[in-house]
């Protein structure tokens, strides 16, 4: 199942300038998702990070992965209309810079669920090269 920006906005509450998933190419609700963030020089964070050498902050790369995870979870029938909250990050490793012009491929697999809480294994790549990998903990609220 593929989703455009309008469908994404129907699932998660994030909006500009904090919506960091531009499209979802693959979606298996409650299991996994693959999506993309097109990184352009127009991103608000490049004004200060860093003016002479723009680099997408690593925490925002992880936030993009968390938003993709929220899409995967909130697409499940039992979680539709709810909000997914970030619970924590484990084993985060940053492997390369993400700069204007890059297309960040986002992938997450939900590996554990216990009630409304769980863990996702996530990776973001640029042209097949790892940018960041981590485990994301989450909880679905009301």
Swiss-Prot record:
Gene: fabZ
PANTHER family tied to this protein: 3-HYDROXYACYL-[ACYL-CARRIER-PROTEIN] DEHYDRATASE
GO BP term, pick one: lipid A biosynthetic process
Top enzyme category: lyase
DNA repair as UniProt keyword: no
Catalytic site: 49
Membership in a protein family: Belongs to the thioester dehydratase family. FabZ subfamily.
Keywords (A to Z) from UniProt: Cytoplasm, Lipid A biosynthesis, Lipid biosynthesis, Lipid metabolism, Lyase
Protein name, as recorded: 3-hydroxyacyl-[acyl-carrier-protein] dehydratase FabZ
Lipid biosynthesis found in the keyword field: yes
Pfam families the UniProt entry points to: FabA (PF07977)
Compartment(s) where it occurs, according to its Swiss-Prot or TrEMBL record: Cytoplasm
Protein role: Involved in unsaturated fatty acids biosynthesis. Catalyzes the dehydration of short chain beta-hydroxyacyl-ACPs and long chain saturated and unsaturated beta-hydroxyacyl-ACPs.
Catalytic reactions on record: a (3R)-hydroxyacyl-[ACP] = a (2E)-enoyl-[ACP] + H2O
Gene Ontology CC entries for this record: cytoplasm; membrane
GO molecular function, a single term: (3R)-hydroxyacyl-[acyl-carrier-protein] dehydratase activity
Enzyme Commission code(s) on record: 4.2.1.59
Domain of life: Bacteria
Source species: Clostridium novyi (strain NT)
Listed InterPro entries: FabA_FabZ, FabZ, HotDog_dom_sf
